[in-house]
Amino acid sequence: ELISNSSDALDKTNNSLTIIDSGIGMTK
């Protein structure tokens, strides 16, 4: 459970970073 929870948190963080990156790319 701990491992899966950690990976889920990493996935959410990666998804957020990807969305932010794409947003910055669109504004440029």
Swiss-Prot record:
Principal location class: cytoplasm
Keywords annotated in UniProt: ATP-binding, Chaperone, Cytoplasm, Nucleotide-binding, Stress response
Alphabetized InterPro entries for the sequence: HATPase_C_sf
Keyword presence, Disulfide bond: no
Locations listed in the record: Cytoplasm
Record: residues binding ATP: N5, D21
Family: Belongs to the heat shock protein 90 family.
Description of how the protein assembles with itself and partners: Homodimer.
This protein's name: Heat shock protein 81
Lineage: Eukaryota, Viridiplantae, Streptophyta, Embryophyta, Tracheophyta
